[in-house]
Amino acid sequence: MRSKSKRKFLKSIGSAGIFFAGANLPVWAINFSANASASDQSYNLLKPDQNNLMLIKGFTSRVVATTGKKSFKGSKYRWHKSPDGGATFPTSDGGWIYVSNSERSENTGGVGAIRFDSEANIIDSYQICKRTSRNCAGGLTPWNTWLTCEEHPRGYTWECDPFGQKKQIKIPNLGMFNHEAAAVDPETSIIYQTEDSGKGGFYRFVPQEKITGMGQLLDVKGKFQVMQIVYANKVQWNDVPNPLAKMKNKKNDFDLMKRKENKGISYTYFQRGEGAWYHGGKVYFATTRTNEVWEYNIKENTCKPLYRGRGALAKPDNVTVSNTGLVMAAEDRDNMEICGISKNNNSAFPIVRIKDHHKKSEVTGPAFDPSGTRLYFSSQNGKNGKVGITYEVTGLFNKLS
């Protein structure tokens, strides 16, 4: 434990961090068999490099975007403020696109994109979503679109074209609440969503048909449901009467499940549900307030903590998974690290640390290029609390375990 803030935070955690609403459920309803090891492995981060990043030996970094500056000289787009959640998309020429949310309020948010060629040269930069608010995290889809989530109680999820050729689409089917992130099962097109609030639900939208292209989510019929963990990690999904229920009193019905039409529905609530990512039949998501990363196994229909805050990782926020299945989480402040969760014993270990006193910032938007050798992420507000910086780190991530 390396900082006073971490020691204080971890000391305050006395429970598993999941709670039950709408039903009196027994304490033994959750089997916490996935406790993190007390001792974390370490790859011994080196001294800060020229970009003030502490990296594993053999890894290198570069800055690809800075708030207010052009990433590509031939573009009109200047990189946005408050870069947040992100993802990458392959292109037909062997390159890829990295998309990044802008977590700004009052319809000044949106999503920006950087396009790379097959040699990782930046060849374009542009905006794919605009005039939205507090675009926090989101989720990539199997049909190659980006779902960007508005983090405010009247927020929606918007579908965007990473190539910037089609207009953004608001998706009411995915509810109106304090959205954080989304993850899509490619087998069924079911969309899982987190809610960033003190008593937020973990939701899913089950479409009646498989989604194959942009815009189909707008009209498809389906069920909107909330998770309830009922016994030994087993899950049941309960229908939400009105996923578009309006907030009338911020103090009493900020959370979707506390709004009048939805009260009385049993559900398990999570404290500050954050980033989410699909990989290999599982959905991983973080809860920042309780310092945990969760694993929902779709086939087994179980949900349990993969990591509980007793080690290197504190205040997990955005989540991603490497090509080899290593779950990684970015910290909301604390030590400004991206940590991996070991596949051997579920302990956490730092992979990247941002130095140089980024005290008013957080690590956001981790995502790999298609090869799995380049990791993109941002310091949301940089050293001065105003200028976001987006990085690329190159290394043998597939060797980490």
PLM segments and residue spans:
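C-terminal segment of N-terminal export signals and the immediately downstream linker at the start
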Residues: N24-T66
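Blade-edge beta-strand/turn elements of extracellular beta-propeller
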Residues: P48-T67, G74, F116-C129, W158-N178, ...
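N-terminal export signals
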Residues: R2, K8-N31
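Beta-rich, blade/repeat-based domains predominating
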Residues: W79-D93, R131-P142, M176-S189, G264-G281, ...
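Conserved beta-strand positions in repeat-built beta-propeller and related beta-rich domains
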Residues: Y98-R104, T148-E151, Q193-D196, F285-R289, ...
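Structural motif
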Residues: N107-G112, R154-W158, G200-R204, E292-W294, ...
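Well-ordered mid-protein domain cores that form the structural environment of catalytic cofactors
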Residues: W96-Q168
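Blade-level signature of beta-propeller repeat domains, shared across WD40, Kelch, NHL, RCC1
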Residues: A367-S401
